[in-house]
Amino acid sequence: MLNVDGVEHEVSLDATLLEVLRGELGCTQVKDGCSPQGQCGCCTVLVDGVARVSCVTPVRRVVGRSITTAAGIDPDLSDRIVTAFEATGGSQCGFCTPGIVARLVGLARRGTPTETQVRTALGAHLCRCTGFQPIVEAALLALDPIQPLPERRNPAAAEARATLESGRPQVGGADVVLGAFRFAADSAPSGTKVAVAQSTGGYSVASTEAEAAAASGKVQGRNSTIAVRPPLPIPMVEGAVISLATSFVEPAYVEPDASWCAEGGDPASPFANAGAFGAKRTSTVSADARRLADELGEPILAIWPREEVVARGAKRPPLSLSIRADGSGRLTVATTEGSEDLAPLLDAVAEIAPGLEASIVEVPGPKVGATHRGAVVSEVLAALAARGLAPGDPATVVAPNGARATVSIDPSNGTVKVDVDAGDPICAITLRSYVIGAVHQGLGMVRSEGIAVDEMGVVQDLTIRSFGILTATQTPSVVVEVIDASGPAVACGVAVMAATMAAAWATAGHPPTWPTA
């Protein structure tokens, strides 16, 4: 017997705890972001009060023990956690949040945690949205029983700002924080057959995800020993004052591509509660779900395992550039076979840097996308802003939409200071959360993010931890000043990300390749 959130269940013993929770018991508040890698933390639950990653926990080891999901925690503590997350903007898309909540509840058993303890505990989790700091702030509020809680943010205002930033409808609240919100893989009707993507390009279909995954011949993700390297040489430009070459970067949205569809119906959107930084817009998973449902004559849930998300999904386009002091120079953007047209990116660059001679060159590699947040434009804005910057100098960027960000990094302690003008804030709490998330991604772009691609263009880094995303302990403190402007609200992401990249690059001494690590 297995006790889950206070209820006894008879379950299969030849399975992982995650397979039982989701597949047999319908506990969709436990999310699957990378199974069975055990690296994203989305499937974390409490086993006798101790946080465990359920995708790598055999059920046999926990029979007779008490399993608690985010939905089963003490109601008073649950309410404090939701209030704290809403007060700090600690959840955006929310896919990672229920697992983090479980981790934090387990941490609280040892007493009121410190910031260092919270950040260390979050080392088991990936949050691509918030940059971790709003989560840390929420934890320190919620887990200190004598700490008064601030008011929750206005739901309508928060939704409006979040939707503007993510480019897709996004909601918040208790359902998102505690996992009741249903993402695409959670919303398929009971009994829907599951199609798991194969590395050969097809799908294996079975009654359960576990059976389909086993039939797919899925190869466990791996970390490569191949170095991350830019695929393009830096262009030779006489008089250039700054040069750069970047690598393939995995967007690393935490919710894998998934969609379900009934025969003759419309497929569920893989954008359940966020925009995935624009990176899912080329995903075929919805079309695949519709095709399979029509071919098989029944509802089908199509899922890409994490390894297939990496292998099939579009990457941020690599580029190389050299720029003179007057803004003239050369820019080369890499495309690959099967990628979408990148010409619109060159048109966008021409608007912000008319002196750049830009071209597109095909190289071996995974597909790249034109719709990733600020792709190419952010890097060019960062390079223009970084000219002449010394460590600690503020970098200011005005994005094409009019958003303005000024970012400085204290060389003595790494603290990041951001002043942001995104028009009407609508909800300053939500805007601040998105600012910190953009800082996190901008720092990662310069310092650590990139994936290894072999000479044939095949991605070799297929695990969450191989993408180079900064962890909670690696992410510095971010101080945000939101300028309460009266103009129309605009998204802050490109401006903040580009200004952060410029400041981080200057702090590192303008090395010619990213990532610098």
Predicted regions and their residues:
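Signature of N-terminal electron-transfer/Fe-S-associated modules in redox systems
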Residues: M1-E159, S224-I226
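Cofactor-binding beta-sheet edge motifs in enzyme active sites
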Residues: L2-N3, E8-A15, T28, S35, ...
